[in-house]
Design a protein with these regions (language model features):
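Helix-to-loop junction immediately C-terminal to a conserved catalytic motif
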Residues: 45
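Conserved ABC transporter NBD signature motif
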Residues: 50-65
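Catalytic Walker B motif of ABC-type/P-loop ATPase nucleotide-binding domains
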Residues: 137-141
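Helical segment within the ABC ATPase nucleotide-binding domain
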Residues: 151-164
Length: 216
C-alpha cells in the first residue's frame, strides 16, 4: 500500500496539491488524471520535496530505490546511443529482455539517445522503465507524442504489468486511462475530486466535465 498523507506541494505562489491524502493498494494499476498529477508523481519519485505531508510504502518511507520513473519529457546523457542505454539497463537488470520490448516500441539502436525526436525519446524511456524490476513504476504522460500504434502497444504493456502484480501509477488525461487501470483518481483544487473503479469511466467523465477538469 502506498499512503499519501496530507501532501502539500507549492510552486512559487501556486499551490499544486493542498493536503491531499490517497491510499493506493499494491499490485494494481492506478490512473491519475486532473490538475497536479505530474507534481504528484515527481513527489513520489523524490524529484519534488513536499512542503508538508508524507509518503509511505507498506508503512515505511517510500525510497527512490523502490521506484522507477518515466518523465513526461525524457532526457538522456549526450553521446550515449540507444544501444548504450539498453546495455546499461541489462547490466543493472540481468535477465531483462530489451529485444521483446523493442518489437513493441521500436527505437533505432545506433542513434544518439539525446538527439532522438520526441516520440522516439519517449519510446526509449518507456522501454527502459519497463525493463526495470522495481516495485513501483511511475509513468508521467506516457501517451503524449506517441503515434497510434505505439500508444496501443503501450496500453498492452501496461495491462501486462498489471497482470504481473506490479504497482503502476499512470498520470495522463482521463480519456487515455480508460481500459488500462484497476481504478483511477481525478485531481482538482489541490486534492482528490473523485475516485473511480475501472467500470465507472462514464461517471468519472461526467463528473470531471461538470467540474471543468475533464480534459486536464
Amino acid at each position: 500500500m502506498i499512503t499519501i498523507d496530507a501532501l502539500r506541494i507549492c510552486d512559487g505562489e501556486r499551490t499544486l496539491l493542498d493536503g491531499m491524502t490517497m491510499h493506493l493498494p499494491a499490485n494494481a494499476v492506478h490512473g491519475i488524471a486532473g490538475e497536479g498529477r505530474s507534481a504528484l508523481l515527481q513527489a513520489l519519485y523524490g524529484l519534488v520535496v513536499p512542503d508538508a505531508g508524507r509518503i509511505t510504502l507498506g508503512g515505511h518511507p517510500l525510497r527512490r530505490c523502490d521506484v522507477g520513473f518515466a518523465e513526461a519529457e525524457p532526457r538522456f546523457w549526450p553521446g550515449l546511443t540507444v544501444r548504450d542505454c539498453l546495455d546499461l539497463a541489462v547490466r543493472y537488470n540481468p535477465g531483462s529482455n530489451p529485444a521483446a520490448m523493442l518489437r513493441r516500441l521500436p527505437v533505432p539502436l545506433d542513434a544518439e539517445a539525446a538527439a532522438l525526436p520526441g516520440a522516439e525519446r519517449k519510446r526509449l524511456a518507456l522501454v527502459l522503465l519497463l525493463l526495470n524490476p522495481k516495485r513501483v513504476l511511475l509513468l508521467d504522460e506516457p501517451f503524449r507524442g506517441l503515434d497510434v500504434e505505439s500508444a496501443f502497444m503501450l496500453r498492452q504493456l501496461i495491462l501486462q504489468l498489471g497482470s504481473e502484480g506490479r504497482t503502476v501509477l499512470v498520470a495522463a488525461r482521463l480519456a487515455e486511462l480508460d481500459g488500462i487501470c484497476d481504478d483511477f483518481y481525478v485531481l482538482g483544487g489541490g486534492g482528490v475530486r473523485g475516485r473511480y473503479e475501472h467500470y465507472e469511466f462514464a461517471r468519472a467523465v461526467r463528473e470531471a466535465a461538470a467540474s471543468g477538469i475533464a480534459e486536464k
